[in-house]
Amino acid sequence: ILSGLVGSEMCIRDRYTVLTEGDASLDPVAEEVRSILDGHLVLSAELAQRNHFPAIDVLQSRSRLMDRVVEPEQRQLAGHLRALMARHADIELLLRTGDYVAGSDPLADEAIARQGAIEQFLRQDAAETSGFDDTLRALRKVLG
């Protein structure tokens, strides 16, 4: 995504698609593209295989412009969502092996408690539509 101004309004000016095979972080072309674009959405084959659509890997996707185009509340909510998702990813092996000790990490405990709601929030049927206000309200509820 490459942004720019149209009059006094910020807008998406261009969209580019880069197809990588395997780990995109090892692909020099993908890394170069990430370095120059204002934002990128990373699609995950693993999410698609789990029937999670849209298959956007939130933790790998970035926006350099988010702080400039969203209200402080939305920025805070999105940051908290990402923090919970990152912590859950950090402890996933401990959860699978039964080695996580509840109460040892408040953020991890919250991530575990909200994981189902987060996954449901991030899924959307192809025919489903959701306006901005409805989406923000749903995000507040997930993190509530």
Each language-model region and where it sits:
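Conserved NTP phosphate-binding and transfer environment spanning the P-loop NTPase/kinase superfamily
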Residues: 17-144
